[in-house]
Structure formats: structure tokens, C-alpha cells
Curated annotation (Swiss-Prot):
SMART domains assigned to the protein according to its UniProt record, in alphabetical order: Tubulin, Tubulin_C
N6-acetyllysine sites (modified residues): 40
Binding site for Mg(2+): 71
Source organism of this protein record: Euplotoides octocarinatus (Freshwater ciliate)
Catalytic residues in the record: 254
Protein name stated in the entry: Tubulin alpha chain
Swiss-Prot/TrEMBL GO biological process terms: microtubule-based process
Keyword Ligase: no
């Protein structure tokens, strides 16, 4: 079996996690108490969904996941929510003190008290796997826990499980919408360790997802629940091939192989189509070509950046539902002829496609329409550098005056770590710039890129 362990860190990570497990349970027909009437092999079996769920002897399906937070309220919502019987109480780990939007608290003072307990629980889950293939992390980097404890945990996982791949879904601060003044600090410090300790990071940002909800689903004032349900659909599409049997299945490590040209260039853009409300879906026939085109629309991107300003290096299309390879090939061929969608000249093929025959599932009472087919795209584009340069600019404005820095230093950080992280990100922006430059014929690859 190729199991995957999910790790949800901080409030953002846990709430996205809730939406995901809610959806996974619906997709597999698992009830809130963990029973699965359709599962014929009680207490074990080698079904595809066992990558995400382990089974007890009594036929209960338990997610291979841990939820970590430095304060109890969000974990308590899981403990008392609809799916309270689904999770093992040991999988919900909460501290008593908040990280207070402070990376240093999450990473040094308070995080380090809880991190060994977390690793211990993760070790228990890992021992329960026959062939662990990697970890999927869920966190936001604007706050203190997701950024601080998130990076601490990723660093420790690199040490304990060196070769296992780590994929993260990282919620980045948005250009306009802000939840904390010190977001730029936390994000820069956190990205510094994401650079080293994750293999693929999928960038999401609330503002981009808000706009999609507002525009495509006609929700006037989207709530976090609306956002998380949409994000859950994306994550579900990416992991569908791990959880169901399909024609062209894609493994977690395959994402890495196909999307990451250089180790540092591993921040991905994602998009999902069709995002459409039930009223509209009734009137529209969404063909494979149409959903493929709309997944390349700048407006469909789940992070605020314009892919037309950059070049694609690689692109992974995960189709699900009523889709045949012939249609996919035709749709991709059309995309390649479009002038607006540019690939770097050293990546001529650039597409990896997966098809999964399980149609998308919708949450009852949710916003999305039930459709026959959907596509999720993850792409590596040089345009994502916009996200970094935006954060770096905000970081510089604050750091020039050393504003708020004493809160971090007071928790045992050194000021040097700020400039180190900032320089690392400056180098990353430079890397993205170089990757997009046309290579001159005959001189081959640039040296100096690692």
C-alpha cells in the first residue's frame, strides 16, 4: 500500500482539513462514525482508499491524519463537530497557549514544547503503514502556528523521514485582505524553511478564492466555509488518484518528478474548473475542452498572480469523471497552440495528465453544482514570483523601521534570521527570473543554477 499521512497545522490547516475529510468521507461513503457500508473487506483489505484511511478490526475507518494547534478552540470544534467519532482522540493535539501570530512563538518557545508529542503521534501513524509514500501538510503562513510550528515540524520530518516526499498546501496572505499586521514577517520566515523542507508547495490565497466564489458561485459575501469547500475540491482532485482506481493514476512522488525542474522552484499554482453554481450548471454543457480552457484562465487561479506575465515550466492536469484520453489529448493540443499560454523553451512537452473515473462529489447544502466531469490543474509557472515579491515588499517596509521585531527577538529569535530569510527569498525571486529567460541556442544550460 502507498499510504499518505495528512498533517493539519494551526487554525487555517485544521479548517481546510475539516472540509477535506468531510468531502473524502462523502466520496467514499464513509459515515461520520467511521463505518463504511460498501466496504466488503472488514478490518483490512487493500482498497485504494486505504491510502488515506486505516481500518480497525471493528470495521471503523480512521483518517491517517493529525491535527495540531497551539490553542484548543479550533481542535475543540473538531472534537465536538459532526465527525467527532471519526478521529482518534490522540490525533487531535492542542496546546493551551496561542502562538499569537508570532512565528517565533510557534517555532521556538511554544512550538518546541509540543513538537515531540506531534512527532510521536505521527510515528504511530507511520508504523501503522505498510509503505508510507509521504506527507501532505496543510497550513497558512500568515499566522503564528501554521508558519512557526509548521516549519518546525517540516524540519523535523526531514530529519526523521528523510526520503519521504512532503507536499504542502500553503495558504499565503492575500494582497488586499489581511488578518494580521505581521503576516509579511511570518510568511517570509516560514517560506525560508518551506524552500528547504518541502518537495512541492501548492500556493493558495484567500483573496483569489474569495473572488472565485463571488464571481462564479454568486456568493455575495463568502465565508471561510465557502472557501474551504472549494479548496477541498482541489485537494480532493489531486488526491483522487491515490484514493480511487483510475486509468492514469498519479502518485505523490510523480507530482514532484513532473513539476519540479530545480529543487528550489517548487511553488505551484493551482486552479479548478468548473466552479459553477447549481442554477447555472443546469443550462451549460461543460465539455473537456471547455473545462480545460477555463482552468488556464487567470481568473481561475487560486493564488493572486497572473500566469500571462510568466511562463509555464510544467503543468499537471487531473481530470475526473466522464473523461476519455482522446478528449484530453485534443484539449491539451488546443492549449498548446494558444499564444497566451507560454511555456519556457526548455520544456517542450510540459503536460502531465491524469484521469480518474470517479466523478466529483458535492457536499449536501454546498455551493458547487454536481457536474459530470472536472479538472484540477497544478502548474509550475514563473508568475508565482509575483506572490513572493509582493510579500517581500511589505516585509521591507516594516523591517526598514524594525517594526514589531522585538516581539520575535523576545521569543528567542535572532535579528539575523530575518535578513537571512529575506535574502533567501530575494535569491528565490532571482531564480524564477533566470528560469524564464530564453536559453540561447548552443550554449546549453546556465551554470550556477542548482
Amino acid at each position: 500500500m502507498r499510504e499518505v499521512i495528512s498533517i493539519h497545522i494551526g487554525q487555517g490547516g485544521i479548517q481546510v482539513g475539516n472540509a477535506c475529510w468531510d468531502l473524502f468521507c462523502l466520496e467514499h461513503g464513509i459515515q461520520p462514525d467511521g463505518q463504511m457500508p460498501s466496504d466488503k473487506t472488514i478490518g483490512g483489505g487493500d482498497d485504494a482508499f486505504n491510502t488515506f484511511f486505516s481500518e480497525t478490526g471493528a470495521g471503523k475507518h480512521v483518517p491517517r491524519a493529525v491535527f495540531l494547534d497551539l490553542e484548543p478552540t479550533v481542535c475543540d470544534e473538531v472534537r465536538t463537530g459532526t465527525y467527532r467519532q471519526l478521529f482518534h482522540p490522540e490525533q487531535l493535539i492542542s496546546g493551551k497557549e496561542d502562538a499569537a501570530n508570532n512565528f517565533a512563538r510557534g517555532h521556538y518557545t511554544i512550538g518546541k514544547e509540543i513538537v515531540d508529542l506531534c512527532l510521536d503521534r505521527i510515528r504511530k501513524l507511520a508504523d501503522n503503514c505498510t509503505g508510507l509514500q509521504g506527507f501532505i501538510g496543510f497550513h497558512s503562513v500568515g499566522g503564528g502556528t501554521g508558519s512557526g510550528l509548521g516549519s518546525l515540524l517540516l524540519e523535523r520530518l526531514s530529519v526523521d523521514y528523510g526520503k519521504k516526499s512532503k507536499l504542502t498546501f500553503t495558504i499565503y496572505p492575500s494582497p488586499q485582505v489581511s488578518t494580521a499586521v505581521v503576516e509579511p514577517y511570518n510568511s517570509v520566515l516560514s517560506t525560508h524553511s518551506l524552500l528547504e523542507h518541502t518537495d512541492v508547495a501548492v500556493m493558495l490565497d484567500n483573496e483569489a478564492v474569495y473572488d472565485i466564489c463571488r464571481r462564479n458561485l454568486d456568493i455575495e459575501r463568502p465565508t471561510y466555509t465557502n472557501l474551504n469547500r472549494l479548496i477541498a475540491q482541489v485537494i480532493s482532485s489531486l488526491t483522487a488518484s491515490l484514493r480511487f482506481d483510475g486509468a492514469l493514476n498519479v502518485d505523490v512522488t510523480e507530482f514532484q518528478t513532473n513539476l519540479v525542474p530545480y529543487p528550489r522552484i517548487h511553488f505551484m499554482l493551482s486552479s479548478y474548473a468548473p466552479v459553477i453554481s447549481a442554477e447555472k450548471a443546469y443550462h451549460e454543457q461543460l465539455s473537456v475542452a471547455e473545462i480545460t480552457n477555463s482552468s488556464f484562465e487567470p481568473a481561475s487561479m487560486m493564488a493572486k498572480c497572473d500566469p500571462r506575465h510568466g511562463k509555464y515550466m510544467a503543468c499537471c492536469m487531473m481530470y475526473r469523471g466522464d473523461v476519455v484520453p482522446k478528449d484530453v489529448n485534443a484539449a491539451v493540443a488546443t492549449i498548446k497552440t494558444k499564444r497566451t499560454i507560454q511555456f519556457v523553451d526548455w520544456s517542450p512537452t510540459g503536460f502531465k495528465c491524469g484521469i480518474n473515473y470517479q466523478p466529483p462529489t458535492v457536499v449536501p447544502g454546498g455551493d458547487l453544482a454536481k457536474v459530470m466531469r472536472a479538472v484540477c490543474m497544478i502548474s509550475n509557472s514563473t508568475a508565482i514570483a509575483e506572490v513572493f515579491s509582493r510579500i517581500d515588499h511589505k516585509f521591507d517596509l516594516m523591517y526598514a523601521k524594525r517594526a514589531f521585531v522585538h516581539w520575535y527577538v523576545g521569543e528567542g529569535m535572532e535579528e539575523g534570521e530575518f535578513s537571512e530569510a529575506r535574502e533567501d527569498l530575494a535569491a528565490l525571486e532571482k531564480d524564477y527570473e533566470e528560469v524564464g529567460i530564453e536559453t540561447a541556442e548552443g550554449e546549453g544550460e546556465e551554470e550556477g543554477m542548482e
